[in-house]
Every structure is written in C-alpha cells, then in structure tokens.
C-alpha cells in the first residue's frame, strides 16, 4: 500500500486513538495554562514585593525554571513527586501535569510583568496623586489596562504548551505522541501516523494562532 492508502487505513482503524490523543493534549494544555496563569500571577506580584528575600526567591525560581530544559523538569517531577509526600502516590499524569504547570507559571509571570509595565506610568502617578493606594491603583487602574497586553500573550503560551506536551509522551500520558507510539507499535508504520499527528498539531496551532491574532486586533481597536 502507498502512503496515502496507509493514512486512510490508520484513520479508519485508529481514528479513536488520534481523537483521544488530541483530547489529552488539549486537556494537558488547558489545565497547565489555567493553573500556570494563577501561579504566574502570584509570582509576578511576589517579584515586585518590597521585601528583598521574597523578590529574590521568586526571581530565582523563575530563572531556574526558564534556564533548565522542560524535559529535565518532567523527569524530576515524575520520580521526585511520589517520594516527596509520604502516603501520596500521584499518577504519572498528575506528576507530569504539576511539572508543566510549574514550568508555565515561570513564563506566564514574565508575560504578566511585561503587560503591567506596558501600561503608561503616568496613569499610575495620576491615580496615586488622587489618593488611591498602591493596591487600588494596581487593581483598578493598571490591571484592567494590562489585560489587553496579557491575554494575547497567554493565547500564545497555550499554543506553545500544545507543542510542548509532546515531550510528555516519554511517560505515556495519553497525548498525541503517546498514541503515535501505540499505533506505530501495532502497525509497524512510522511515517504515516507521524503525518496524521503533524496535521493535527498544525490545525490546532494554526487555528488558535489566528484566533489570538483576531483577539489582539480587537484589543488594539479598543484602545482607540
């Protein structure tokens, strides 16, 4: 059979596995970016804390995570997390998810920090001169405007995470590349399932990138 016929055969026989892999990939990415955004917001606040020790710890965490390969982090959490808490034996999926969340948080914190810094400093000064506290200024003036810079960047982080979850296949967590290993082992085909999975990844990331571009244009239009 030719490559095209093999692709048709794989879709017909293993379509459910490709769909399952897509579901797991999206699930991993969504949960990672959601909780990564929450933790990243906390890190961004801590990095601007007035206490040096707090700033130093958050900065060190961000730099260490961003300065080490994500695959290394996945390995560390896969083998460390079950041993770290006595009596708690998380599944491989949970271990990998925690590692991805902590990785994403470091990058999201910088996204949020950049979004906040993009807001005109003059507005902060005006708000403080009108009697608003630093906290009130941040939540009532700065953050509502920073959102238009942050949201598109978070969309790009989600797209990036879809691709990075492919590394989780090393631990067989059900994502697209895990399904590739299953299908390839059952059929002894390599190129054809990779082509199908490549198309799925492209469709996901391309459609999402277009959505992010539309969101970014609308955010910019709202500035006028």
What is each stretch, according to the model?
Residues 1-224:
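Transmembrane alpha-helices and adjacent helix-loop boundaries
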């Amino acid at each position: 059979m030719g490559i095209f016929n093999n692709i048709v055969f794989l879709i017909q026989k293993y379509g459910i596995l490709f769909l399952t892999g897509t579901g797991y990939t999206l699930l991993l990415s969504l949960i990672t970016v959601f909780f990564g955004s929450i933790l990243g917001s906390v890190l961004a606040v801590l990095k601007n804390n007035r206490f040096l020790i707090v700033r130093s710890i958050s900065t060190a965490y961000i730099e260490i995570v961003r300065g080490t390969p994500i695959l290394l982090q996945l390995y560390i959490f896969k083998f460390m997390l079950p041993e770290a808490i006595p009596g708690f034996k998380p599944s491989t999926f949970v271990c990998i998810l925690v590692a991805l969340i902590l990785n994403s948080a470091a990058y999201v914190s910088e996204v949020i920090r950049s979004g906040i810094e993009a807001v005109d400093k003059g507005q902060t000064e005006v708000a403080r001169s009108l009697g608003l506290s630093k906290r009130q200024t941040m939540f009532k003036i700065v953050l509502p405007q920073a959102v238009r810079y942050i949201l598109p960047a978070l969309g790009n982080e989600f797209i990036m995470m879809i691709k990075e979850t492919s590394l989780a296949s090393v631990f067989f967590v059900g994502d697209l590349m895990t399904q590739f290993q299953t299908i390839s082992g059952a059929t002894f085909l390599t190129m054809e399932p990779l082509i199908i999975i490549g198309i799925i990844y492209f469709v996901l990331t391309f459609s999402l990138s277009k959505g992010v571009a539309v969101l970014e244009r609308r955010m910019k239009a709202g500035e006028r």
